[in-house]
Amino acid sequence: MRLAIGLLMVGQLAAAEATVIRGRTVPLTQLPSGPSQSRLAVVFLPGDGGWRGTAITIARNIASWGFDVFGFDTKKYLEVFSADGERLTTKELASDMRAVAEQVAGMPNRPVVLVGWSQGASMAVAAAAGLHARTPIHGVIALGLPQSGVLGWDWKATLAVVAHREPDQPAFAVRPLLSASSPVPLWFIHGSEDEYTALDTARSLFRSAGEPKHMEEIQGANHRFEGHQSELFQALQRGLSWITTH
């Protein structure tokens, strides 16, 4: 079996898990919706900052709406596959994300929605591209989708982000993947003041996507949606509801 999950309970609010992908361990955190398993599961893919801060806040809010949420540490994933000069391919990244979705879906399979933010959004789109059937991935919600996603991460990349520079890492283009995403429903959420991907660029990416799709713009919001989390959460709720009807 190419992917397995081991569970270690760390408290009532969340469970820390380890997901083994092609022999390498990547942190996963489950935030259950309640005493019973929810009908739909969400895999939350944060940005290159990993599983911390705002990413956890967003995931906890989604769980509070009655969804089982699994927070995948995108930064750690990229780091463990960048060891010794290695780099992922786009095909490997997409396959890995699909494997995580399949494991989270469980048996019998339940629908899974990938909610990605920034780098995580590019990874969610990659996972959806080229699927001939939606199961188990029934939809993607992309927050602050960039034009490209990276295929590796190291300490120099972290310093580049702090300095507001592009990390010197191999990357993949998002636009061609968007056109290959149909029939998986795509819900875009973008801040009008996003400092990494301009709104006009985000609109252009949206036009490249296959149907069904929908885009919501949050006026005044930056890439982190600071000061606009209420609007963000409302848009997320609408997106999850919309995906369940498609």
Can you describe what each PLM-predicted range is?
Residues R39-G47:
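Short beta-strand element of the alpha/beta-hydrolase
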Residues I62-F81:
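Conserved alpha/beta-hydrolase
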Residues G85-G106:
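Alpha/beta-hydrolase active-site loop
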Residues Q103-V162, Q169:
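Primarily recognizes the serine-hydrolase "nucleophile elbow" in alpha/beta-hydrolase
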Residues S181-S182, F188-H190:
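Short beta-strand/loop motif that positions the catalytic acidic residue
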Residues E195-T201:
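Conserved alpha/beta-hydrolase "acid-adjacent" motif
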Residues A221-E231:
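Catalytic histidine-centered segment of alpha/beta-hydrolase-like enzymes
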Residues Q229-H246:
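Catalytic active-site module of serine/aspartate enzymes centered on a nucleophile-bearing elbow/loop
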